[in-house]
């Protein structure tokens, strides 16, 4: 693990101590956050407003290496050895950075492992969900996972069951659109298909916004010193499909959709796009994927006042294999 991590060593920013906590919301800093999602390894790269030249950055360690102690491997000193900012005592969630996976009781369509069929949690779709119940459970999860009410680090809400833009629920998320149209058909049996789709879109997006906005607001109210945001936004969907049709830039349609959810970015303290890489992409295509997604995140950040920071999630294991990124990131 340390050999893999050495690929990403960098000179720490002169304005911060390696043992310091997460940055304030108003201080521009370059950072790399090393983190994990389930059993995978993550890195978070906080880009300074200038994308052309990054002179220094900090590394934040948020990997559950406390589990390695039983095997004789001890990681609690990586902050001293590699100038890494690390949660005290090498905890996964701690004073510097904490991530919440699917917290609360968001409406969702979940799969039963035994039958592979979907069942509804809290109504299945946001327009059928109980917001009060969700927020009550979210607050309970927040108290359990981040008990320190003075937590002043980075707080990430990782909710990926559906996206607040109705159209973007495609592929494996198509059931959310199907259920939304079905609900409208039951409410309006004589409406045309186009009318049903428009009403499904309107209600899904209005209530989806309410769930995401109120969750973020509650997190900020209960842990006001932390810097909060949602993982993976803004979406871009670049470098997908056949090689001949892949594009570095987010499509104009996606950019317009991201403009429609400025409420999400205005309500966040930090913007957390994802630039996970696929091994099947060529090195130049991987560069294009990163550039396009970071460019879109910075574009969105430039529309916020005050301008939000951008922390980019980069997993240093490919998403389509178990191979580590090596040469392509040197």
Ranges and model annotations:
Residues 27, 32-35, 39-60:
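N-terminal signal peptide
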Residues 48-93, 120-128:
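N-terminal module-boundary/linker segments of secreted carbohydrate-active enzymes
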Residues 61, 97-101, 155-157, 228-230, ...:
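Hydrophobic faces of well-ordered beta-strands that scaffold small-molecule active sites
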Residues 85, 140-141, 249-262, 291-300:
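Alpha-helical scaffolding within the catalytic cores
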Residues 96-108, 167, 174, 179-196, ...:
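Aromatic- and acid-rich polysaccharide-binding/catalytic face
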Residues 102-225:
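Substrate-binding cleft of extracellular glycoside hydrolase catalytic domains
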Residues 199-257, 303-321:
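Aromatic-lined carbohydrate-recognition surfaces of secreted/lumenal glycan-active proteins
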Residues 260, 266-322:
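Glycoside hydrolase catalytic-domain groove-lining segments
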């Amino acid at each position: 693990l340390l050999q893999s991590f050495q690929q990403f060593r960098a000179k720490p920013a002169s304005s911060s101590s390696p043992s310091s906590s997460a940055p304030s919301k108003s201080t521009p800093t370059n950072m790399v956050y090393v983190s994990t999602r389930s059993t995978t390894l993550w890195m978070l790269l906080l880009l300074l407003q200038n994308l052309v030249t990054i002179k220094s950055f900090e590394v934040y360690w948020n990997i559950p290496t406390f589990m390695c102690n039983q095997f004789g491997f001890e990681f609690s000193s990586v902050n001293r050895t590699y100038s890494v900012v690390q949660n005290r005592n090498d905890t996964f969630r701690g004073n510097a950075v904490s991530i919440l996976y699917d917290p609360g009781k968001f409406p969702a369509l979940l799969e039963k492992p035994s039958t592979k069929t979907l069942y509804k949690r809290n109504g299945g779709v946001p327009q059928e969900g109980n917001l009060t119940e969700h927020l009550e459970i979210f607050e309970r999860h927040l108290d359990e996972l981040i008990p320190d009410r003075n937590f002043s680090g980075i707080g990430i809400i990782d909710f990926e069951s559906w996206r607040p833009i109705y159209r973007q629920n495609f592929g494996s998320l198509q059931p959310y659109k199907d259920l939304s149209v079905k609900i409208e058909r039951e409410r309006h049996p004589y409406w045309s298909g186009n009318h049903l789709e428009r009403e499904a879109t309107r209600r899904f997006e209005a209530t989806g916004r309410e769930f995401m906005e109120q969750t973020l607001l509650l997190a900020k109210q209960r842990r006001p010193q932390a810097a909060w945001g949602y993982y993976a936004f803004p979406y871009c969907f670049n470098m997908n499909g056949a090689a001949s049709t892949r594009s570095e830039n987010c499509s104009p349609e996606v950019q317009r959709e991201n403009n429609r959810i400025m409420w999400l970015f205005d309500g966040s303290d930090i913007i957390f796009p994802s630039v996970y890489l696929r091994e099947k992409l060529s090195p130049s295509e991987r560069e294009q994927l990163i550039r396009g997604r970071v460019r879109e995140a910075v574009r969105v950040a430039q529309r916020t006042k005050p301008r939000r920071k951008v922390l980019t999630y980069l997993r240093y294991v490919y998403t389509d294999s178990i191979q580590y990124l090596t040469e392509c990131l040197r």
